[in-house]
């Protein structure tokens, strides 16, 4: 089997530069950080509950969707790709209504 290691450098998003309107790629991590900064700035100092779960679901649900498409619904293959148990994958799919 071919060992395919995904590095964080491969997880990039494309955004449009505000001044030049040219597409710019940046790591997914930067996009998540910026989204969190924007979200917290809109709170104007108010407390928020369950932020961790909210952020996790915003990332996890689309990831599951794309991986299940990529594996053509093969849960065993998807679980291996994600490095999780197939039972855990099934629970996550059910949680997001993807079963």
From Swiss-Prot:
Signal peptide: none annotated. The lineage of its organism: Bacteria, Pseudomonadati, Pseudomonadota, Gammaproteobacteria, Aeromonadales. This is DNA-binding protein Fis. One of its GO terms (molecular function) is DNA-binding transcription factor activity. It comes from the Bacteria. Keywords: Activator, DNA-binding, Transcription, Transcription regulation. InterPro entries: Fis_DNA-bd (IPR005412), Homeodomain-like_sf (IPR009057), HTH_Fis (IPR002197), Trans_regulatory_Fis (IPR050207). It comes from Tolumonas auensis (strain DSM 9187 / NBRC 110442 / TA 4). Belongs to the transcriptional regulatory Fis family. It holds the Pfam family HTH_8. Homodimer.
